[in-house]
Design a protein with these regions (language model features):
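N-terminal subdomain of nucleotide-sugar transferases
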Residues: 1-29, 49, 124-189, 193-194
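Membrane-proximal helix-turn-helix segments that form the acceptor-binding/catalytic region
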Residues: 99-126, 249-253, 262, 266, ...
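Conserved donor-binding/catalytic core segment of Leloir-type glycosyltransferases
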Residues: 146-148, 345-370, 382
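Nucleotide-sugar-dependent
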Residues: 156, 361, 415-419, 425-448, ...
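Carbohydrate-associated surface elements
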Residues: 185, 302, 323
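Nucleotide-activated donor-binding/catalytic signature segment of Leloir-type glycosyltransferases, i.e.
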Residues: 384, 392-421, 426
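Conserved acidic donor-binding segment of nucleotide-sugar-dependent glycosyltransferases
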Residues: 471-472, 476-483, 492-498
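A short, well-ordered alpha-helix in the C-terminal region of glycosyltransferases
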Residues: 492, 499-514
Length: 532
């Protein structure tokens, strides 16, 4: 028996497949290979593999758009059985006969629903674009806030977004704000039972990513707005999301200010990184959110300039960089135990990277730098996380992984991140410039987490990173994308432990003083005090 495995995201699920099909040979097909060419060419590519079982691995079944199409595709390619597995134990399993028998009705239903959603959304968007967005201000020492998370993707993945949400919500609560959270998924690492938390689950409807997002905007808005009306908040705080208008509709309905956390243009992301499609329509959703918001919180000065260039009034924009929970991310957070688990000796230096293996994180450049570090230098490298470039990095470091010099952990639980960071002596943030030449607009959460850990830091001198960190004081800064400089900086900290320790101590002091989530939340409440 042969299982052909397509890993869209998340865990590759080999262990689960081995459990389901113990006698099977498991053969992988890359996402790039699968997505190359026309539908007929893709079908021929998969047929040529002669699968008995076609398996699709995804992060979360609840968030996998086009499930039915993937399943039917596998059946058309000749697989006797098609399974979809997620990284959290979810499983969908159907026979070829059942899939093909139900295919006409399934495809007709997908097409009809998509058309209805699109027509309805275009009509509603036109109405919302012509509204005037005023609000009443109810000033109080203990404001009530509804926090909206409507991002079209799972919230259970550890990373900067999860840290941001958790950090802001908990800091607002600590400052005396009554916070109610309405989200379309659980949030990694968030387990505060004292804060009301409602989850509006998505529906796996929509053949394309844009249609999936548009449909689930309607699902989320219909459920969230009545909840917000009952909560009667003094302001709504929404993390801006692709194809979303829930905060706009709710703020208009209750006549309260909408505070929009804007981490970057989804239109830009859709054009350069994440090809979601329907960009003209997405641009209208984005403009609607920016116009309806009473205040827009951006993470960097570059993003403020980007918005002003688009005509957003400067008075609406608040620069509010990311932060860190300095009590959670601290020296002595459990690194000694992690080192024992991983077989790392007490006299070995560990240089670590934690984050997404994505286009601008520079993880490929870090892999190339690792190969330039002399083999006789007593240093090991720890890579924590996953993403679209994981396979390429793993391939580049095949020999180093085999020798034990490089360790990959894959995706880890959010609460384990401080322990893994604490296991390191040096932390690396090798971000690279944006591919289209745009100014770097990010505020990487990992920078503040690295600083709070009190470790030596090597980072790219790029955008806000180069403003927050000072060369030779709180980090060694290198030119973005310069592999030789990156390797040299790592070597320097390995060979001069005194400098490494001093940089770490300085960095933690600055993080605790200036870059906590409490300070981030204070800026939100200062904006509330001054709005109106």
């Amino acid at each position: 028996m042969k299982v052909v495995l397509l890993a869209l995201s998340g865990n590759t699920a080999r262990d689960k497949l081995t459990e389901l099909y113990p006698e099977a040979e498991i053969e992988s097909i890359s996402r790039t290979e699968f997505e190359t060419g026309s539908v007929m060419k893709r079908l021929a590519t998969l047929r040529a593999r002669r699968p008995d079982v076609f398996a699709i691995a995804t992060e979360r079944l609840a968030w996998q758009r086009g499930q039915d199409l993937f399943m039917i595709f596998g059946a058309l390619a000749g697989a006797r059985e098609v399974v979809m597995i997620d990284a959290h134990g979810g499983l969908r399993r159907e026979s070829r006969f059942d899939l093909l028998a139900g295919a006409p009705a399934t495809l007709a239903d997908e097409a009809t629903t998509g058309l209805i959603d699109l027509l309805y959304s275009r009509r509603e968007l036109l109405t919302l674009e012509h509204e005037k967005y005023g609000f009443l201000v109810n000033k109080t020492d203990r404001p009530r806030v509804v926090y909206l998370r409507a991002t079209p993707g799972p919230g259970t993945q550890a990373g900067g977004a999860a840290s941001h949400i958790k950090g802001v919500v908990e800091a607002l609560a600590r400052l005396g704000t009554e916070v109610q959270i309405i989200s379309n998924d659980a949030i990694a690492g968030f387990d505060n039972p004292k804060l009301p938390f409602t989850i509006i689950s998505p529906e796996t409807v929509g053949a394309t990513r844009a249609l999936f997002d548009i449909h689930n905007n309607l699902v989320f808005t219909r459920a969230a707005v009545p909840l917000i009306e009952r909560a009667a908040p003094d302001f709504i705080y929404q993390r801006y999301a692709r194809f979303s208008w829930a905060g706009v509709v709710a703020a208009s309905r209750i006549q309260r200010p909408l505070f929009l956390e804007y981490n970057g243009s989804e239109v830009w992301v859709g054009r350069h990184w994440d090809h979601v499609g329907s960009l003209d329509l997405l641009e209208r959703y984005e403009r609607l959110n920016l116009e309806a918001a009473a205040r827009i919180f951006v993470v960097s000065e570059v993003e403020r300039q980007n918005l002003e260039a688009r005509g957003v009034p400067a008075a609406k924009i608040v620069v509010n960089p990311n932060g860190v929970d300095a009590e959670l991310f601290r020296p002595g957070a459990g690194g000694a135990e992690v080192r024992r688990e991983l077989g790392i000796g007490g006299d070995e230096v560990v240089a670590g990277f934690v984050g997404t293996f994505g286009p601008w994180h520079g993880v490929v450049q870090l892999a190339e730098a690792v190969k330039k570090v002399p083999a006789n230098l007593r240093v090991r490298f720890l890579f924590v996380g996953s993403g679209s470039l994981y396979g390429e990095v793993e391939r580049l470091l095949q020999a180093e992984t085999a020798s034990g010099r490089v360790i990959f952990t894959g995706t880890v639980a959010h609460e384990r991140v401080p322990q893994l960071l604490d296991a390191c002596d040096i932390l690396v943030s090798p971000h690279v410039p944006l591919a289209d030449g745009s100014d770097f607009f990010g505020s990487p959460t990992k920078i503040f987490e690295y600083m709070a850990m009190g470790k030596g830091i090597v980072a790219s001198r790029l955008g806000q990173i180069g403003e927050v960190l000072s060369d030779n004081e709180t980090a060694l800064l290198v030119e973005p994308g310069n592999v030789t400089q990156l390797a040299s900086a790592i070597i320097k900290l390995v060979e001069t432990p005194g400098l490494c320790a001093q940089i770490g101590s300085n960095a933690r002091g600055v993080a605790v003083q200036n870059h906590t989530w409490t300070r981030n939340a204070e800026r939100v409440l200062e904006a509330y005090d001054n709005v109106g």
